[in-house]
């Protein structure tokens, strides 16, 4: 196998994730590269083929019915490694950012102090077709949280600092694919997970389940929850199916639901069951 240092070919204007300025492998990459070095000849190629077969069998694809020229979703055998201390800083910053966005939503759908004080231009909100005036709470009990999901696009600049490219708050996709990719990688390259302290993702699923349950009305001990999908023609239908299984909730379409007296019910063979919260 050729020198792993030869894998790095970043231009001078870009940050080299693998190699330092002194041409040495960064410490947090040494574990995974050591595992790859230890594989027998052709081992990595065989692992990649195995992973791709698993993804095909599980149906982990992105439907490209509207764009036949779009590239397919492919498996990258080399995971992106982030040092623990660096991830801790990223995590803290993203939590703070998500909390800020949630408080902004709570204000816009509540007292609207940001508009009254001129910190946010009123026309920016009222002229936006996505602003749901009927959901504004002027009296009564407001939701404990408005932003249930949050994703972000990050980029690292040449100086090594991370910057936010875009915030995604309207049903961001990708979590299901990340979970499936981790599962397949763990089965295809188990040596890495035995020798490297990898942070597991199960807690993410558990917390997501708990956050959905928290959206149910007060006093509901065992809320009925579901994942709502547009159907099998959706570009991310695999993710909807996968998340429903991981969250242990039913996958439903619009035709499975009915509304009576402003309450959503899930239609079943025998009766209709009140739906307390859902992921869409």
Identify the role of each PLM range.
Residues 1-279:
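Preference for protein termini
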């Amino acid at each position: 196998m050729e020198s792993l240092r030869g894998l790095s070919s970043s231009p001078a204007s870009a940050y080299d994730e693998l190699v330092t300025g002194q041409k040495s492998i960064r410490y947090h990459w040494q574990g995974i590269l050591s595992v790859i070095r230890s594989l027998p000849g052709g081992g990595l190629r065989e692992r990649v083929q195995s992973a791709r077969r698993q993804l095909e069998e599980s149906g982990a694809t992105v439907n490209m019915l509207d764009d036949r020229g779009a590239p397919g979703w492919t498996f990258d055998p080399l995971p992106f490694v982030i040092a623990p201390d660096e991830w801790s800083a990223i995590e803290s910053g993203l939590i703070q950012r998500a909390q800020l966005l949630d408080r902004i939503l709570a204000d816009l759908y509540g007292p609207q102090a940001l508009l009254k004080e001129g910190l946010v231009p009123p026309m920016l909100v009222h002229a936006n077709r996505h602003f749901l005036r009927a959901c504004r709470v002027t009296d009564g009990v407001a939701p404990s949280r408005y932003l249930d999901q949050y994703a972000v696009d990050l980029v690292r600049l040449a100086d090594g600092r991370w910057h936010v490219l875009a915030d995604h708050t309207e049903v961001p996709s990708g979590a299901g694919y990340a979970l499936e990719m981790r599962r397949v990688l763990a089965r295809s390259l188990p040596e890495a997970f035995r020798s490297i302290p990898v942070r597991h993702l199960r807690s993410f699923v558990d917390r997501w389940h708990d956050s959905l349950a928290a959206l149910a009305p007060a006093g509901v001990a065992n809320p009925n929850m579901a994942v709502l999908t547009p159907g099998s023609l959706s570009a991310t239908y695999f993710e909807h199916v996968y998340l429903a299984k991981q969250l242990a909730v039913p996958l439903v379409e619009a035709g499975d639901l009915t509304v009576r007296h402003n309450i959503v019910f899930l239609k079943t063979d025998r009766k209709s069951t009140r739906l307390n919260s859902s992921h869409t």
